[in-house]
Amino acid sequence: MLRAGALLGGLGAAGALVGCGDDGSSAGGSTTTAAGGGATTGALIASFPQSTPYIAAGSPARLPYLIADREGVPLRSIDGPVRFTVSRDGTPVGEPVEVTPRSDGVPRAYLPLAFTFADPGIYDVSAEYGGSTLEGSVQVVDRSKITTPMVGDRLPAVASPTTANAMGVDPLCSRDPVCPYHSVSLDAAVASGKPAILVVSTPAFCQTAVCGPLLDHVMEAVGEPGGINVIHSEVYANPTAVDDLAKATVAPVPKAFDMAFEPALFVADASGVVVSRGDIIVDRGELAEMLAPIR
């Protein structure tokens, strides 16, 4: 069973960026090597879960990376595009990928690497930036080890808290003022035959400096939903009743999805199939691209 603490601990490097807007950071095991072989400043930071199964073999992965300065603080702007190379046992896998930095409306600039890893195993990921090679590694697991819905999966038809039935979640929405996305339950939305947008986030209790205003961006982008069901699910059921969020009860949707991270965006088409997913950090431009398939 998912514990509330896992929502913080599963982020690896990103989880070390405690407190929204905090400038503290950790490179989380990533290393930095100059092109000539000597040490240099900066590091590649994986802003996605590292200590829990997250990347599935054979499924498209979106891996947001940050670049840190010499003090380990993530850069607010990144010159790009940045070239990424994926390798295994010293052998490149596929072609290098040029990644455009994103930073519109988020606390830190980031690089969303899109890559499909064919097989389970440990892969090396490197990025060329400022004349240096920034290196890290990722673990890819068999698809069966991941239960959170991925692109191509059906969005699970589970009940979510609403204004009519809060299901024990208090507050129902921690945004101030509250958002308008708590009138329809997720199971009803999936069965409606309409596209759906699901945001799992806790605006008032964000625990990383990169979580960003995802819910606000969705509100800004969607406006009047019209023929689209938009649902916001809080992460914790009782955050104000505990003195430590690690002791809080996980809310119904992230518990049902077995999520070890937040925030997250799931975009499903009219048939209920997930067509886009954005975890941890999503800027305005990338959000527009994720919503495009249902607009």
Segments the model singles out, each with a brief description of its role:
Residues 191-205:
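Short active-site neighborhood of thiol/selenol oxidoreductases, capturing the structured segment around
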Residues 19-30:
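Bacterial lipoprotein signal-peptidase II cleavage site
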Residues 263-276:
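A short, hydrophobic beta-strand/beta-hairpin element that forms part of a small beta-sheet core
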Residues 235-261:
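Thioredoxin-like thiol-disulfide oxidoreductase module
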Residues 208-223:
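Typically the conserved alpha-helix immediately C-terminal to a functionally engaged Cys/Sec
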Residues 35-122, 126-171:
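Contiguous segments within soluble domain cores/interaction surfaces
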Residues 1-21:
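N-terminal export signals
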Residues 274-295:
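Non-catalytic, surface beta->alpha helical segment in thiol-disulfide oxidoreductase systems
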